[in-house]
């Protein structure tokens, strides 16, 4: 599960698009997708005009124009990609009753990322 938080004034449509970009970041890290993989993302905004209030009548809302969200999309991609790598690099060797899965060798990962321009 990926959670994307922003203080940008996005409406439901913009937040849905932002969450989708976070999923794209998994592909950057080599993730594969299949039926039942369970990969999903949600996004929310903390912008003050998105808050529900008890004030009577219609509330004015500020929404970032569609043509102004590319920077947010890139930021969601970059932050998600970094979070995946941070998680992988904090892993330790894990042993079950059948096998041991070794932690990723950080130096080898750095070399691979450099080789492929990441």
Positions of predicted regions on the chain:
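A structural signal for small-residue-enriched, beta-sheet-centric alpha/beta enzyme cores
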Residues: 1-118
């Amino acid at each position: 599960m990926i959670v994307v938080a922003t203080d940008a004034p996005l409406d439901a449509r913009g937040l849905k698009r932002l969450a989708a970009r976070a999923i794209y970041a998994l592909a950057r890290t080599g993730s594969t997708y299949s039926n039942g993989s369970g990969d999903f993302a949600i996004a929310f905004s903390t912008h003050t005009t998105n808050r529900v209030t008890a004030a009577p009548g219609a509330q004015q809302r500020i929404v970032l124009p569609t043509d102004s969200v590319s920077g947010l999309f890139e930021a969601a991609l970059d932050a998600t990609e970094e979070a995946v790598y941070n998680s992988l690099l904090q892993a330790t060797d894990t042993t079950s009753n059948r096998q041991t899965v070794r932690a990723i060798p950080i130096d080898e990962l750095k070399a691979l990322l450099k080789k492929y321009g990441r």
